[in-house]
Amino acid sequence: MRQKTLDVLEFEKIKSLVANETISDLGLEKVNQMMPATNFETVVFQMEETDEIAQIYNKHRLPSLSGLSKVSAFIHRADIGGVLNVSELNLIKRLIQVQNQFKTFYNQLVEEDEGVKYPILDDKMNQLPVLTDLFQQINETCDTYDLYDNASYELQGIRSKISSTNQRIRQNLDRIVKSQANQKKLSDAIVTVRNERNVIPVKAEYRQDFNGIVHDQSASGQTLYIEPSSVVEMNNQISRLRHDEAIEKERILTQLTGYVAADKDALLVAEQVMGQLDFLIAKARYSRSIKGTKPIFKEDRTVYLPKAYHPLLNRETVVANTIEFMEDIETVIITGPNTGGKTVTLKTLGLIIVMAQSGLLIPTLDGSQLSVFKNVYCDIGDEQSIEQSLSTFSSHMTNIVEILKHADKHSLVLFDELGAGTDPSEGAALAMSILDHVRKIGSLVMATTHYPELKAYSYNREGVMNASVEFDVDTLSPTYKLLMGVPGRSNAFDISKKLGLSLNIINKAKTMIGTDEKEINEMIESLERNYKRVETQRLELDRLVKEAEQVHDDLSKQYQQFQNYEKSLIEEAKEKANQKIKAATKEADDIIKDLRQLREQKGADVKEHELIDKKKRLDDHYEAKSIKQNVQKQKYDKIVAGDEVKVLSYGQKGEVLEIVNDEEAIVQMGIIKMKLPIEDLEKKQKEKVKPTKMVTRQNRQTIKTELDLRGYRYEDALIELDQYLDQAVLSNYEQVYIIHGKGTGALQKGVQQHLKKHKSVSDFRGGMPSEGGFGVTVATLK
């Protein structure tokens, strides 16, 4: 966008306020570079960036960025062979520390805000490199001011020698200054330093009493700073040690600089990301100060700013107005009194668009909508008196000519007092002609004017809407309220009456104006009244909509909570049912053991009623509501003895042995016979006779040691296998042969997997060639 536009709209002041919120020179640099983008995707992304950080900033305490500085110059110097000093290394260390703290904060944030996504910040955190080793190397080698003594073995030895030598020098000099004989010869009984040498202050007249080197004298010349000869050699030794220390420090710093150079790319990424975060946090801080909101950007041309206000004005006193280009409206003409807020409205619209396209939240209520403009053109200036018409008019017209050269359908054009500064009739004609031209170009236009001719401009042109700033006749002052769709009317008669002008004069003046103009003023007055009524209703409607949305949100949350509660109850019921089934399964195992014992005790003579009594113990463990399937009354023909049925509550097949009455029947399920409700039975359709049918007899002599499952469907084969194994166990068989055939191998695999889980099977193997080979599985029973 043109710099002139940004200057007129005072965007630099906004940037200055954002800059005040930055912590580092990195963030400050990015604020100074901040400009409105014109690419739709870029504008949307910048706004998403700011809004995401603002959401986090408004809910959480962000880690401090204090001490973050620009270090790219140090990194580049390290890369070309320069040596960094301790201060520069500490700034690099602080960069790493800040990024690590932000990483930790983000990880905690993700854990706390479970389900909330921060995709942009997540991407930035993923960009941050791991620099733990470099941080530790710097941190363990130096503090804020100097290298640690133990930074190297050599440095520690040198500094130890310096310390011990200094101590000897001090002891020597202390004896001199504390000597009673020397008290009157010294200016002060202290040891001081001159030119990095330990000296004592001697009065000039006693110079001959002290052997040594004079290093300095006082301004008056009355005190000489003498290095006694007794410590000259020790001071020389200190100088040599200081030189050795400097060489060792240079070596250590060179080594650390090498580590920095090795991580140069990672450090530059860290600097870039943290600088961007400082910039975004500054935007978020400023946005909160103006209670900024996130606009929705539209591909088509849209401007809707609910209760917008100028961010540079005092928020406590400024009047917020809704600025809107309604559907199919391309031009808005604002009329009204001087100092009524027309110019502020233009600047508010222009500045908000510039802010939004720079990624700043805007000072409006929620729900604002904007399109992205390639450029914003302004002709806004202070009003001048008619005596300055030539300079004022020429200045405005020069600017307008420049605007008309460059404006297009992607532009927003703001005209303040269009056509002002010349003859009113010519100015009004020019204003209408200029507006026609800009509308033909396709630009979106908002213009302010004094000319009454422009009030009628919208009535014979499509896409043009009037607006006005309200004037309070009672207080004789503007209210600064913007009335969209209502042209401004003249208040001269009302103001004059309020100020005490004679009614005769006012009434005579009214007869001098045309009937049409009088009717227009009355129409405008009626429009103002209707606008206020509609605006009041709209505000009430907005309030009701918000209340409805809140109720909807509350109900949605309650419904979700109810669903979660219902789900938890179902899960709890399932868990209880599973526990019951587990207990029932164990009970079934006990029944089988009891049956074995009965068989051993009574041989093959196991009475039916004993078996049913044992099974009844299993039935008692099932609760119909918790583990039964959804039972529906059978829809087939009437069930009679001999029918094959499915027992719904157990999901098992059976055969009806006897109909006890209209409600109950005795059913044989495998080796178990039970009395069941008829409504719990579902009649099975007759199937073709299979080669092998289920074994129902329990005599050991009639149960074969082999089961032929060839021709069975997968599910039926497993049911048949279960029944057979139960009977084989009761017959005390140790080994049985399951014939499944070779085929595709699916039945073989299913049989063997089932045997692996069956509690009565201790082992199984494939058949030997003499036993049938791969078409047979041999199972060993427990």
Curated annotation (Swiss-Prot):
SUPFAM superfamilies: DNA repair protein MutS, domain III, P-loop containing nucleoside triphosphate hydrolases, SMR domain-like. Coiled coil: none annotated. It is an enzyme of class 3 (hydrolase). Residues 707-782 form the Smr domain. ATP binds at residues 336-343. It holds the Pfam family MSSS. SMART domains: MUTSac, MUTSd, SMR. One of its GO terms (biological process) is negative regulation of DNA recombination. Its EC number is 3.1.-.-, 3.6.4.-. CDD domains: ABC_MutS2 (cd03280). Keywords: ATP-binding, DNA-binding, Endonuclease, Hydrolase, Nuclease, Nucleotide-binding, RNA-binding, rRNA-binding. Gene3D superfamilies: 3.30.1370.110, P-loop containing nucleotide triphosphate hydrolases (3.40.50.300). The keyword Ribosomal protein does not apply. GO terms for molecular function: ATP binding; ATP hydrolysis activity; ATP-dependent DNA damage sensor activity; double-stranded DNA binding; endonuclease activity; mismatched DNA binding; ribosomal large subunit binding; rRNA binding. InterPro entries: DNA_mismatch_repair_MutS_C (IPR000432), DNA_mismatch_repair_MutS_core (IPR007696), DNA_mismatch_repair_MutS_sf (IPR036187), MSSS (IPR046893), MutS (IPR045076), MutS2 (IPR005747), P-loop_NTPase (IPR027417), Smr_dom (IPR002625). HAMAP family: MutS2. Belongs to the DNA mismatch repair MutS family. MutS2 subfamily. Endonuclease that is involved in the suppression of homologous recombination and thus may have a key role in the control of bacterial genetic diversity. Homodimer. Binds to stalled ribosomes, contacting rRNA. This is Endonuclease MutS2. It comes from Staphylococcus aureus (strain NCTC 8325 / PS 47). The gene is mutS2.
